[in-house]
Design a protein with these regions (language model features):
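Domain-scale recognition of functional cores that engage charged ligands
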Residues: 2-175
Length: 175
C-alpha cells in the first residue's frame, strides 16, 4: 500500500482531514499559495480541494481586519480563515516583488496553521536519505557519495532547497 503504516485509502483520508482541517469547517480552512493556478504542483491542490473540501486561495486574495484573515468564496461572500494549509514557499514569495499582500506572515494573526510555514525546509527533500522502504527511492546527498556511479543514466540530481522542479539535472555527467 502507498499509505503509511498500512492504512487504507479511507482511513488515510480521515486522518488527513483531521490533520489539515482540525476542528474547523472546510470552508474556513484554505490551501494558501502564490498564484496557485500557475504552480507546477497545482494537481496536488485540486486533489486537496476535492478530497478535503477546502478552497485554494492565492495570498493576494487574502484580506486582513485587525488580526483576522478573510477570503471571498465563489459566491463572493467574505469568509473568515481559521486555519491555513500553507503551500507558500518563502523563497518564491520574497522574489515576487510584484505581489501585493494585505498581511504579513510575520503578523500576530488569529489563525491556526496546518503545518508551520517554515516546515517545508525540514520535511522536504532533506529527509529523503533517511526514509527507507518499498515506496521510497534510494536517495543520497551528493556530499555523502563515496564514488561516482558508472550508470549515471539511472540518476537525477536535485538541489536540496529548490522547489517545483527547479534545478533538476536529468542527464547527469561525471563533470
Amino acid at each position: 500500500s502507498p499509505y503509511p503504516n498500512g492504512l487504507d485509502e479511507k482511513v488515510y483520508l480521515e486522518l488527513l482531514k483531521k490533520v489539515i482541517l482540525g476542528d474547523f469547517n472546510p470552508e474556513q480552512v484554505v490551501l494558501l499559495e502564490v498564484e496557485p493556478e500557475k504552480q507546477n504542483t497545482k494537481i496536488d491542490f485540486y486533489y486537496a480541494k476535492r478530497d478535503l473540501g477546502i478552497p485554494i486561495v492565492c495570498v493576494t486574495e487574502v484580506s486582513k481586519e485587525k488580526n483576522q484573515l478573510f477570503y471571498r468564496n465563489a459566491q463572493g461572500e467574505k469568509i473568515r480563515i481559521r486555519r491555513i494549509y500553507n503551500r507558500v514557499i518563502f523563497d518564491e514569495l520574497h522574489a515576487r516583488k510584484d505581489l501585493k499582500l494585505q498581511f504579513s506572515f510575520e503578523d500576530l494573526l488569529d489563525v491556526e496553521w496546518a503545518g508551520h510555514p517554515n516546515w517545508y525546509t525540514r520535511i522536504s527533500k532533506f529527509i529523503l536519505p533517511y526514509l527507507h522502504g518499498p515506496y521510497f527511492i534510494e536517495t543520497t546527498l551528493l556530499s555523502e557519495l563515496k564514488s561516482i556511479p558508472d550508470d549515471l543514466e539511472n540518476y537525477v540530481l536535485k538541489p536540496l532547497f529548490s522547489f517545483s522542479g527547479a534545478g533538476v539535472v536529468f542527464h547527469v555527467k561525471k563533470e
